[in-house]
Amino acid sequence: MKFVDEVEIRVEAGDGGAGIVSFRREKYIPEGGPDGGDGGDGGSVYLQADENLNTLIDYQFERFHRADRGTNGRSRNCTGKKSDDLIIMVPVGTRIMDVDTQEGLGDLTQHGQKILVAKGGFHGLGNARFKSSTNRAPRQKTLGTEGEVRNLKLELLLLADVGLLGLPNAGKSTFIRSVSAAKPKVADYPFTTLIPNLGVVRPEANKSFVIADIPGLIEGASDGAGLGIQFLKHLERCRILLHIIDVMPVDGSNPVDNAFAIVNELHQYSPKLAEKPRWLVFNKIDLLPADEAKALCEKIAQELGETENIYSISAINKSNTQPLIHDVMTLLESMPKEKFVETTDEEVEFKWDTYHQKAAKKSDDDDDWDEWNEDDYDVEVVYER
Ligand SMILES: Nc1nc2c(ncn2[C@@H]2O[C@H](COP(=O)(O)OP(=O)(O)OP(=O)(O)O)[C@@H](O)[C@H]2O)c(=O)[nH]1
Ligand SMILES: [Mg+2]
């Protein structure tokens, strides 16, 4: 399946249905008052996270999503029907942004979580709302309000605890293969990995964490070199970064320069990401005799100015990977789970209620009567005998 992690869609909530101005006898208010019913509310649009989905690809082809408008009210106090809400299913990990205002609307990080993205229009009020004994019509506008319309950017961010960072060919995919059941492609050329991979690591029977392998970064990636830095967004939700450094690059480049290049790109992308705990993992130590490997790793660490959280491994031989995994698990357990901005169902209901109350109050305030002019109303007017 193709991995698509960014799409733009347009969502349109339904307009509120019109309330009806109805009189039983021509231009006269019947006993018991006018009886035009309210319209129905327009349908709202929600995005909901579904753990069974893992791509946004469907929305690349299906960009317009519209909820129905509420139906109009009718005479004899018939209220119009509220339209069904439209629920758009997206993968867990989807971040939502309003393209026009650049406002973040939320993150869907849990299965079933739902966010209101376009509110349906409020229904127009029928004239049955306006009780009066006089032969006068309501000034109240009876049209429903318009449904919200938004252009949204959806981004799928991997939900991983640990992110792998490094140059192409450093051995990131080999590492994820050695510590998890994930089997991404490994090859002796750069840019083997083109899409992110996730693996679940189980250091002990009842403990696990998720690790993300992303395409390699190169110097100048923030200016578009290589595959660019677009994949770094998948590391935004990680709590620890493992910077994989090839101690014996085949191209003869200097591991120290290589490491600085990666850190530089990280800062270019986001200072916040650069602040995350980042451990150094020297890889491919099997290419040297043990003592030489040890001396080389110490030298590189010293030149990088790092003294803590340094590991030397051979991903291919799975040597020294266990202590690393163990320490990662221990650190993760000591960290608070990050709290994401989310809107609960209750909050959505609350907002909706407040909206109703405001609209109802407005109609009370406007509850005066005036000489009625049919042309003021862009609605169907029903006269019944
Ligand atoms: N000798 C040795 N070779 C390794 C080790 N780890 C990875 N390699 C080799 O290095 C090459 C690149 O490995 P990958 O795991 O594909 O590297 P990557 O970082 O995922 O590369 P990209 O996907 O291109 O970013 C492959 O030929 C691997 O077999 C190691 O510990 N020792
Ligand atoms: Mg790879």
From Swiss-Prot:
Subcellular location(s) of the protein? Cytoplasm
Question: Keyword Ribosomal protein, does the record have it?
Answer: no
Annotated EC? 3.6.5.-
Q: Where are the transmembrane segments?
A: none
According to its UniProt record, which cofactors does this protein need? Mg(2+)
Q: Name one GO cellular component term.
A: cytoplasm
The OBG-type G domain extends over 160-333
GTP-binding: present as a keyword of the record? yes
Matching entries from InterPro entries are given as:
G_OBG (IPR031167), GTP-bd (IPR006073), GTP-bd_Obg/CgtA (IPR014100), GTP1-OBG_CS (IPR006074), GTP1_OBG_dom (IPR006169), GTP1_OBG_dom_sf (IPR036726), OBG_GTPase (IPR045086), P-loop_NTPase (IPR027417)
Q: Which Gene3D superfamilies match?
A: GTP1/OBG domain, P-loop containing nucleotide triphosphate hydrolases
EC class = hydrolase
One Pfam short name:
MMR_HSR1
GO terms assigned for molecular function = GTP binding; GTPase activity; magnesium ion binding
Q: Which CDD domains match?
A: Obg (cd01898)
- Domain Obg residues, every copy: 1-159
Q: Which NCBIfam families match?
A: Obg_CgtA, PRK12297.1, PRK12299.1
Subunit details for this protein? Answer: Monomer.
Q: What is this protein called?
A: GTPase Obg
Gene behind this protein: obg
